[in-house]
From Swiss-Prot:
Residues 144-380 form the Methyl-accepting transducer domain. Residues 1-11 have a biased composition (Basic and acidic residues). This is Frizzy aggregation protein FrzCD. Methyl-accepting taxis protein necessary for the proper aggregation of cells to form fruiting bodies. Frz genes define a system of signal transduction analogous to the enterobacterial chemotaxis systems. Its main location: cytoplasm. One of its GO terms (biological process) is chemotaxis. It is found in: Cytoplasm. Keywords: Chemotaxis, Cytoplasm, Methylation, Transducer.
Length: 417
């Protein structure tokens, strides 16, 4: 028993000594809880957007003072960083607004935005390079627009002049083509007329040859009556000289034919006076008259060309009327008729040859004219196409000029210097 009592006393002292330690632990726990709550509240306040919130030192215990101090420093740095970000964002917004405003207004010469923030410097420098690039671009486009406008105006002027020239050329070619068409028709008509003249000349030549044969018979009959042909030769020489003085051979035909008709009539009259002896003479005179009338019928188609022949025939008839002797008159007139027929043959031959030459020439002219008309038609078609192309080029040049002017107006909105 006595041994147990001493053992119990020391145990009671131990419990007495442990009581203060438990009280201190409770105090420390309360202080830690208060510090934790203060820190937590502060962090929640910061997270809600209040960057000025700090951990109150009076709300933390001794153990949390150092932690609160460190946390407040961190919050200070965070707030400063957020402030710098905010300032940088404002400067960026201002720079962007300034850039957009300059682009909207077109005045690129007023860009001079600077910053003291080393982090924003490269960004603003990049903006400055963009502006400088835009300035260079605007200047180059402006110069190009001016050159384009000048070139477009020159092209438009040249196209307009070319269009005018093409239109005038087309009108001239059209008029020339119309003239050539008229010439073509005229050449065709001339060719037809020349062919008709050639045919009539051939017919007249045949009639003249027939008349020459009849005149030969008549001369033979005259020679049987009268052998003296000196006066007839003189008359023929005079008539030949007169015929040579006549300007156109065709007119001689009508004159000689008319004269032959009168001579035949006179010969018939003389033959009638001679009675039975002049019967053969009358027959030949009648045949000569018939042939002369045939020649007259043939020469009616070229009446306008043989007026002088009528005059010569009339002159020969007048000379025949002056003859007192029927034999001499018949002999002279027969010789004159023979010479006249020879002249007619020569003249008709020349006329026929000339008509053939003219006919050939007119046919060649007609062919050449048709070729020229065809060529002019092709030229007119090409000219029409050229005129249309010129009008299209003028329209394109005018549109290009308008576009160049529009581009110049747009570029004027931007000021690079």
């Amino acid at each position: 028993m006595s041994l147990d009592t001493p053992n119990e006393k020391p145990a009671g002292k131990a419990r007495a000594r442990k009581a203060p330690a438990s009280k201190a632990g409770a105090t420390n726990a309360a202080s830690t809880s208060s510090s934790t709550k203060a820190i937590t509240d502060t962090l929640l306040t910061v997270l809600s957007g209040n960057l000025q919130a700090r951990v109150p030192k009076e709300l933390v215990g001794e153990s949390g003072v150092e932690l609160a101090h460190l946390l407040n420093q961190v919050l200070d740095q965070f707030a400063a960083s957020e402030h710098r970000k905010h300032v940088a964002a404002q400067e960026i917004d201002q720079a962007l607004d300034a850039l957009i405003g300059l682009v909207r207004e077109g005045d690129l010469s007023r860009w001079n935005t600077t910053t003291e923030d080393p982090q924003l410097g490269p960004l603003l420098e990049g903006f400055g390079k963009v502006i400088e690039t835009l300035r260079t671009f605007v200047r180059e486009i402006n110069e190009a627009a001016l050159r384009l406008s000048s070139s477009a105006n020159q092209v438009l002027a040249a196209s307009t002049q070319h269009e005018t020239s093409s239109t005038e050329q087309a009108a001239a070619i059209h008029e020339t083509t119309a003239t050539m068409e008229e010439l073509k028709h005229a050449s065709a008509q001339i060719a037809e007329n020349a062919g008709s003249v050639a045919r009539v000349a051939e017919e007249t030549l045949g009639a003249a040859r027939a008349g020459r044969g009849a005149i030969g018979e008549f001369i033979q009959a005259m020679q049987q009556i009268r052998s003296d042909g000196v006066a007839v030769a003189d008359s023929i020489a005079k008539l030949s000289k007169r015929v040579e003085r006549i300007g156109t051979v065709v007119e001689v035909i009508d004159e000689i034919a008319d004269r032959s008709d009168l001579l035949a009539l006179n010969a018939a009259l003389e033959g009638s006076r001679a009675g039975e002896a002049g019967k053969g003479f009358s027959i030949v005179a009648a045949e000569m008259r018939r042939l002369a009338e045939n020649v007259l019928d043939s020469t009616k188609e070229i009446k306008n060309l043989i007026t002088e022949i009528r005059e010569a025939t009339a002159a020969a008839a007048g000379a025949a009327e002056a003859s007192k002797s029927a034999t001499e008159s018949g002999e002279k007139l027969g010789a004159v008729a023979a010479q006249a027929v020879e002249g007619i043959l020569a003249g008709v031959q020349e006329t026929s040859d000339a008509a053939r030459v003219i006919n050939l020439a007119t046919q060649q002219q007609r062919t050449a004219t048709e070729q020229v008309v065809a060529s002019m038609a092709e030229i007119e078609d090409v000219t029409r196409q050229t005129t249309q192309a010129s009008k299209q080029a003028t329209g394109a040049a005018a549109e290009l000029t308008q576009l160049a002017g529009r581009l110049a107006e747009l570029i004027k909105r931007f000021k690079a210097d």
